[in-house]
Amino acid sequence: MIIDVNTPISSRLDKYLKRLYPLLTQGVIEKALRQKQITVNSQKAEASLRVKGGDKIFINDKFNLPVKQPEKLVFTDAEIKLAKKITTDYLIYEDDNLIAINKPAGLATQGGSKINLSIDSALKYLNYKGADFKLVHRLDKETSGLLLIAKNYLSNVKLHDAFKEKLVVKTYFAVTYGKPIKNVGEVRSNIEKSKGSTPKITDIYSENGKLAITYYKLLKSLDNNLFLIEFTPVTGRMHQLRLHAKLLGCPIVGDDKYGNKEIMPYSKYMFLHANNICLSEKIFGKEINLEAKLPFYFTDKFVEC
C-alpha cells in the first residue's frame, strides 16, 4: 500500500499516520518502522521524521492496518481560503519550530459564540490535512500584527515556557487621542477579569485581579491631538494595552470599549498593531527578531514609515 502525502506543511510521520488511522498506537507504529513494515520513499524512517507533500509512505501488505478511518470533518470555504492565506499572504517567517503571521484587524484569533471564522478554525483545517499547528498566544480581534504559531507540540511547550520566563519581548504601535504626561514611562495596575465580563482596572493594592505592567514611549506627534506611542507589555493580561492607554489618559483611537466620543471620527479601525517580537536565543538556540508591516490605515492616514 502506498500513501501519497498531501499536507502543505511538514508533519511528523507518527502524527500523520495517527490522523489517518486513529486506532494506531505509538508502540505499533515504532515497531512497524523498526521492522521496515512502514517506510518513507522506500527508506527506513524514524517516527520523528517530518513528511511533506510529495513524500510516499510505503506500508507492507502484511501489516494489519486498523480499518477505522478518522471522522470526516467539514470545513467552510472561508476557513479553507483563510488557511491558504496563513501559509502564503499573511506569512512573514517560518522555520522548523514556528511560523509568524501578520494578522489583519477584524480577524479573530480564536472562535466564540458569535465568531464563525478565526485563525484557530483555519489551523484546524491545516491540521486535518497533516500539519500540527498550535496557537501560542492571541491578539484581540481588532488588533493587527504579529502572531506566533507553533509547528509542533515540543515547540509549543518551549514557546509557552518562554512567555512565562519573559524570554519573548513584544512591542506594539498605537495611535492615541492625547498623550501621557511623561514621554517615557511605566504603567502598573491590577486588571480584574470575571467570567463573562469586560476586564477592568482595580487598585494596585487590591486582592482582586492580577498585576499588569506596561512600558511606553512617545514616538511622534500627529495632527488633531493624535500621537504615535510604542507599548511594551511585561505581562500579558486581557486588553492590557487598551486599559493602560486609557489609564494614561490617552485612549487608543478606534477602541470601542475603552475609548471616548472625541475619537469616534477616527474609529473605523482600532489603531493598535503588534509591530515587533524578539525571541531569546535561549528558546531555540538563536535569537529571532520579527517585524510586521504596519497596516495601510496607519501609513495612509497618520504615520509616514
Curated annotation (Swiss-Prot):
Cited InterPro entries: PsdUridine_synth_cat_dom_sf, PsdUridine_synth_RluA-like_CS, PsdUridine_synth_RsuA/RluA, RluA_PseudoU_synthase, S4_RNA-bd, S4_RNA-bd_sf
Catalytic activity: uridine(955/2504/2580) in 23S rRNA = pseudouridine(955/2504/2580) in 23S rRNA
Residue stretches making up the S4 RNA-binding domain: 11-70
Entry annotation: catalytic residues: 140
Presence of the UniProt keyword rRNA processing in the record: yes
EC number(s) per entry: 5.4.99.24
Keywords: Isomerase, RNA-binding, rRNA processing
Superkingdom of source: Bacteria
SMART domains attached to this UniProt entry: S4
GO BP term, example: enzyme-directed rRNA pseudouridine synthesis
GO molecular function, one term: 23S rRNA pseudouridine(955/2504/2580) synthase activity
PROSITE patterns tied to this protein: PSI_RLU (PS01129), S4 (PS50889)
Family: Belongs to the pseudouridine synthase RluA family.
Function text: Responsible for synthesis of pseudouridine from uracil at positions 955, 2504 and 2580 in 23S ribosomal RNA.
Protein name: Ribosomal large subunit pseudouridine synthase C
Species whose genome carries this gene: Rickettsia felis (strain ATCC VR-1525 / URRWXCal2) (Rickettsia azadi)
Gene field: rluC
